[in-house]
Amino acid sequence: MTTSLFPASDFTIPQLADLMTRSFEGYFVPINITESALLTMLKRDSIDLTSSRVMINNDEPAGIALIARRGWTSRLAAMGILSQARNQSLGTQTMHKLIEEAKERQDKEMILEVIEQNTAGVKLYEKVGFKKIRRLVGYKLENPQVESKEELKEIDIRELARLVTYHGLKDLPWQLSGTTIMQHTPPSRAFKLNDAYCLISNPDAKDIVIWSVLVKSRSRGAGLSKVLMMALLSKYQNKIWHVPAIFPEEMSFIF
């Protein structure tokens, strides 16, 4: 089957959101992308719709690939194929074309993340030349009963972004980088406790996402991240906490 690729910028946001949702039906982690969620994703992750592609077969959308770009690096932010179009080499064809286009743009690097239980996805990306770099981990904690007397101080998210750029690991994943953190806005909130910092999603919601945790270089190894987490869980009781699978495994001790 031959697939034609068209710029995602040729389609409306509602069309893209609907295609994203349908393209991930039945996947290891199905997703429901609303228009608002897609717009947030585009802004926060630097997704370029002119470089992103919609797969077309028989004049009908068959899948989507979102490409994020910063400097000389591009990232496959998401790729999904409609259930009726799977197992027909669409993924392989599309990836070869996306890599070719990245070379034409003179990108120096192309990166992506894939859930390790998605064995078909892992095989696809390795087949077209990607190499495993490291493992990313995520967690979930429901209604922890924690008491802490420590006081968190709220700070501007932009300040945290600058600190992450300066003090964070030099090879942080795309979604943890200072550049990404800079794009978060209220109702997300950033806090500090001495030399420890964090960014969370709207704390008024039942489910809260921890988007960033940082301890300044000079204070690492003193257990500040645990003190910070305890203060955070104590401040917002009766919540369901989510750590998305974007944190390098070497940072797992924080959680």
Label for each model-derived stretch:
Residues 81, 87-100, 123-127, 221-234:
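Conserved acetyl-CoA-binding loop-helix of GNAT-fold acetyltransferases
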Residues 102-113, 236-247:
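Conserved GNAT acetyl-CoA-binding A-motif
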Residues 69, 82-84, 88, 116-117, ...:
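Active-site acidic-Proline motif in GNAT/NAT acetyltransferases
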Residues 29-66, 166-192:
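Active-site rim helix/loop that mediates acceptor-substrate recognition in acyltransferases
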Residues 1-33, 145-176:
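Short amphipathic alpha-helix that is part of the acyltransferase structural core
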Residues 54, 60-68, 75-80, 192-203, ...:
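Conserved beta-strand in the GNAT
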Residues 88, 92, 104, 116-134, ...:
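Conserved active-site alpha-helix within GNAT-family acetyltransferase domains
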